[in-house]
Amino acid sequence: MLKYFFLLLSAVGSLLLMGSCEGIFEDLYDTPPATASDGFGFIETNAATKSGTIYIDVTSYKRWTYISLKNKTTDTSNIVMGQEAPAVWDFAMHRYDVRTNGGAAFETSYSTLDEVRSGGIPAGAVFTADTLSQVVIDMLHMIDGYLDYDTCMVNPVLSRWLDVDLSTMPPVYTPSLRPYLLRLYDGSYAALFFANFMDEASVKGYVTIKYIYPL
């Protein structure tokens, strides 16, 4: 995120020179409309195939959303308020940042979860644990020349699921569309496929995750 900061700041400066800018920051700040739907969490599950779909709201920069594949639950914590993570969780998302609960991840060369199911875990797959990083928690001071960050553990492999191009306004978000393997802290495995970063109305900050667990 840091490497894009000056590109983003320059682009915002250009936008401010335009005449009437009502609504121009909608895609930048990703403010959900008042009519945003409420159907979040594990919206589909299939016990026979051990698969399902998770739909979460990650529009806020101040919030982590925690997902437990074992319990099929989601929970949130406010970073600014210092709220702690729930007792049970497997991975979490903050905007497009992803972290694990003592786990590690691997990006596959597959295109679908069906290919993961048939191909399995590739021989020699190297899983990457979380590393110390920074995530943006407030964009309000961007025009003043700085952003507010929080230092935390983030998984660099899982966080590659979305490429964010801030060289244009509005930013361009491109999912990798690659299934990822998540090794949980207990040694079990899951396959995750991040399908998109928007809802049906094309509002950014809504993530659909297809999964298989246990793999």
Feature-to-residue mapping (PLM):
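Positively charged n-region of N-terminal signal peptides that target proteins for export
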Residues: 1-4
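Intrinsically disordered, low-complexity segments enriched in serine, threonine, and glycine
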Residues: 8-9
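C-terminal motif of bacterial Sec signal peptides marking the signal peptidase cleavage site
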Residues: 16-20
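Surface-exposed, beta-sheet-biased, low-hydrophobicity segments with strongly acidic/polar composition
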Residues: 22-215
